Amino acid sequence: PLSMTILSQLDRNKDHNTYVFVLLGIAYSATIGGMGTLVGSPPNAIAASQLHLGFADWLMYGTPVMLVLFPIIIGWLYLVFKPKLGLRFAAEFEKIHMTKQRILTLIIFITVAILWIFGGYINPILSQLLGLPKPIGSFDSMVALSAAIVICVTGIASWKEVQDNTEWGVLFLFGGGLTLSSVLTHSGASKIMADGIVFVIEGGHYYVMALIVAAFIVILTEFTSNTASAALLVPIFISIAQALNMPPLGFAMIIGLGASCAFMMPVGTPPNAIVYATGFVKQSEMIRVGKFIDLTCMVIIATIAYLFWM
């Protein structure tokens, strides 16, 4: 809505490419930005749960990929649509006063971020202070739940407001994905499915395997839920890596990150769907630039995985 308000100062027909550049830039930036942190996208958490990675651990793997992909994606958008970047917009600024609630919200946000990022160091110290025999399990989850409780207790938001503004369907989808991954792993189903795939790719070069897996997940996630795809495939490809005597990190990260790389179809990611729903971006325009971005993501993710994770 904010960008649409700003873009309304332009001529829809004359400056159409600028409209498309800005709107797709926002959608794609949201997708790429989500790769950087554990909470950025459900596939991240699914892959992290199978690899037993914490918030800080994921930052070390996801952030470099995000930083590499972001300028390349903006570059593709510029090359394809050639927007007018020299335009000037009239803007009105409203002074926002720092109320007690806003200050408390900022404090909670900073505290949660610090606890997530430095949880590996803080968790043992906190556990020792509390007299616990071992570090707190699922520390990142406990931090998030504690923050939600503090928000309600301090009156920043009521429980009814939390209920009304929480996307419960997304949470159930996310939880279902984690459950599916766990069931596939512990039931042995992922190993059975992996054995059939190993027979086909065994003996191939690791980089070729990485490219095939990256291409497979990127194409698949264009047409299916990235959460469901990651939930199904992460445990399978971890089993494949183990059968090939490879580190499981490589294939799992390719699936986890690649599941977010849907840039051609409106149904690929929620940001794509939101931008497409504005009516200013055609599906053909998304495909026009998205095919180049998809190919770029396949190569970059596969290359990083091969060089550092396999």
Which residues make up each language-model segment?
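Hydrophobic transmembrane alpha-helices that form the pore/transport pathway of multi-pass ion
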Residues: 1-35, 44-51, 226-257
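Membrane-embedded alpha-helical segments and adjacent helix-loop junctions characteristic
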Residues: 1-13, 163-244
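Structural signature of hydrophobic alpha-helical transmembrane segments
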Residues: 64-70, 136-148, 196-209, 250-265
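Transmembrane alpha-helix interface/packing and boundary motifs in multi-pass membrane proteins
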Residues: 27-39, 215-226, 256-267
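Interfacial loop-to-transmembrane junctions
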Residues: 162, 277-296
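Hydrophobic transmembrane alpha-helices of multi-pass small-molecule transporters
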Residues: 57-195, 292-298, 302-310
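C-terminal ends of transmembrane helices
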Residues: 4, 8-11, 80-82, 151-164, ...
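Hydrophobic residues within alpha-helical transmembrane segments
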Residues: 25-28, 63-64, 68, 146, ...
